[in-house]
Structures are given as structure tokens and as C-alpha cells.
């Protein structure tokens, strides 16, 4: 039976119940926290990457914004590990679900906006009306800026969903083409297989880049409101 092209994006269920929550928790179960101090190359590289990313992401923030550093680092590690685990064969990637990405984007965006209105009310309200706007354009610009503000979490979620989904679809299509060409032309099948390997390597990079971009945009929203 031929598998539907989008079958891998359907949320799996067990006995009629969704098991997305278990899949989301899987990275933490796969990499448990050691009970004693372990210092090896893997841990050293992991700590170096976390420190480097944290330093770059937190450099623009004031003291109030830097209190979000633990949450932002946890976010980038969660999205990155979820994306990479989703590249394994016969696995499911939760970040291909727009509902899940909206579930991450909307609360984070709402928290940054709430922080801005709580601590910098005048500055936050000033974002709705750029300085030097002609009086005739004030009503239209306020509406446009309000719409652009509420589009931010949607764009954040759609960007992550689209990039991860597109990569998985390309791998699925090229993999299917490689299998189909094995019985037709071995040389062409070898070329498509080489393309598949290169695309898989690219998808590993995209998985990490999209995690960084998602977290960086949340960090920039926070910077605008602190």
C-alpha cells in the first residue's frame, strides 16, 4: 500500500489518544541529566555551544531581559533536539504541527508584550505611531501597526512549520525517486541518492538554524519591550 505523502505529518495516536506529549518529552528521556559531574568532550562541546549562543543572544539585553536567558536556552535546545530527532526514519516531528508551534509562539510573544506594557508603557504605546507621522495617516498607521504586532506570533510559528515541513517533503520525494530509479537507471539512482545525502546534511543544519531563528526572534521581541 502506497503511503500518503503527508502521512508522516499526522499526529500519531495510541488507543485513540494522541501521544504528542510523550514524543515531546522524548528528548529529555533520551538525554537524562547525569547524577554526578561528568567532564568529557561531549559535555565540554555542549557547554561551549550553550555559552556561545547565550552570549550572542543575551548581549543586546539589559538586566531585566537577561532574566529570560534560562528560558531562551531551554527553548533553543528543545526545538533543536526535536527537529533533529524528527529526521530519524519512521519518526514524528512535532514542530511540523502548526498547532504546537502556535502553542509555543503565542505565549512567548504575549509574555514579551505584557512585559513591555508593564514596565515601559509609554514606549510600547509609541510603537503604534511612528514619530513624525502626518495627522491624516495616524488612524491608518495605528491599524497597520496593530495588525503587524498581532501577526508576529503567527509568522513565528508559520516560519518554523514551513521550513521543517518543506525539508521533510523534499527528503520524502527524493527518497521515493531514488527507489523508483533503481530499476530503471542505476547511474541516475546513484545521483539522486547523492543528492539525498547532501539534502539530509542540509536538513540537519536547517533543524539547528530554525531553532536558533525562532529563539532569536523571541529574544528580539523581548528586547523591544524591555
Swiss-Prot record:
Coiled-coil regions listed in the entry? none
Q: Topology with regard to the membrane?
A: Multi-pass membrane protein
* Gene Ontology biological process: proton motive force-driven ATP synthesis; proton transmembrane transport
Q: Where, per UniProt, does this protein localize?
A: Mitochondrion inner membrane
Family matches, as PROSITE patterns:
ATPASE_A
| Entry keywords, A to Z | ATP synthesis, CF(0), Hydrogen ion transport, Ion transport, Membrane, Mitochondrion, Mitochondrion inner membrane, Transmembrane, Transmembrane helix, Transport
| Keyword Isomerase on entry | no
Q: Does the keyword Mitochondrion apply?
A: yes
GO MF entry, a single one: proton channel activity
The regions listed as transmembrane in this protein's record are 6-26, 68-88, 97-117, 136-156, 164-184, 189-209
Which reaction is this enzyme known to catalyze?
Answer: H(+)(in) = H(+)(out)
Q: Write down any Gene Ontology CC term.
A: proton-transporting ATP synthase complex
Q: What does this protein do?
A: Subunit a, of the mitochondrial membrane ATP synthase complex (F(1)F(0) ATP synthase or Complex V) that produces ATP from ADP in the presence of a proton gradient across the membrane which is generated by electron transport complexes of the respiratory chain. ATP synthase complex consist of a soluble F(1) head domain - the catalytic core - and a membrane F(1) domain - the membrane proton channel. These two domains are linked by a central stalk rotating inside the F(1) region and a stationary peripheral stalk.
| Quaternary data | Component of the ATP synthase complex composed at least of ATP5F1A/subunit alpha, ATP5F1B/subunit beta, ATP5MC1/subunit c (homooctomer), MT-ATP6/subunit a, MT-ATP8/subunit 8, ATP5ME/subunit e, ATP5MF/subunit f, ATP5MG/subunit g, ATP5MK/subunit k, ATP5MJ/subunit j, ATP5F1C/subunit gamma, ATP5F1D/subunit delta, ATP5F1E/subunit epsilon, ATP5PF/subunit F6, ATP5PB/subunit b, ATP5PD/subunit d, ATP5PO/subunit OSCP.
Q: Which protein family is named in the record?
A: Belongs to the ATPase A chain family.
Name of the protein described by the UniProt record: ATP synthase F(0) complex subunit a
Organism of this sequence: Sus scrofa (Pig)
- What lineage does the source organism belong to? Eukaryota, Metazoa, Chordata, Craniata, Vertebrata
Amino acid at each position: 500500500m502506497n503511503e500518503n505523502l503527508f502521512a508522516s505529518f499526522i499526529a500519531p495516536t495510541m488507543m485513540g489518544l494522541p501521544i504528542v506529549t510523550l514524543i515531546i518529552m522524548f528528548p529529555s528521556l533520551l538525554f537524562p541529566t547525569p547524577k554526578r559531574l561528568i567532564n568529557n568532550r561531549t559535555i565540554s562541546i555542549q557547554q561551549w555551544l550553550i555559552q556561545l549562543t547565550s552570549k550572542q543572544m543575551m548581549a543586546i539585553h539589559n538586566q531585566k531581559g537577561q532574566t529570560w536567558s534560562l528560558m531562551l536556552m531551554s527553548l533553543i535546545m528543545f526545538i533543536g533536539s526535536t527537529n533533529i530527532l524528527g529526521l530519524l526514519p519512521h519518526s514524528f516531528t512535532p514542530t511540523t504541527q502548526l498547532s504546537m508551534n502556535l502553542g509555543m509562539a503565542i505565549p512567548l510573544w504575549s509574555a514579551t508584550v505584557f512585559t513591555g506594557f508593564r514596565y515601559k508603557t509609554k514606549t510600547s504605546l509609541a510603537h503604534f505611531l511612528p514619530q513624525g507621522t502626518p495627522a491624516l495617516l495616524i488612524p491608518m498607521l495605528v491599524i497597520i501597526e496593530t495588525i503587524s504586532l498581532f501577526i508576529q506570533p503567527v509568522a513565528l510559528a508559520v516560519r518554523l512549520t514551513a521550513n521543517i515541513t518543506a525539508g521533510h517533503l523534499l527528503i520524502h520525494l527524493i527518497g521515493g525517486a531514488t527507489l523508483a530509479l533503481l530499476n530503471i537507471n542505476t547511474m541516475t539512482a546513484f545521483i539522486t541518492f547523492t543528492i539525498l545525502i547532501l539534502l539530509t546534511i542540509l536538513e540537519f543544519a536547517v533543524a539547528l538554524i530554525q531553532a536558533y531563528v525562532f529563539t532569536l526572534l523571541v529574544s528580539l521581541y523581548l528586547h523591544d519591550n524591555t
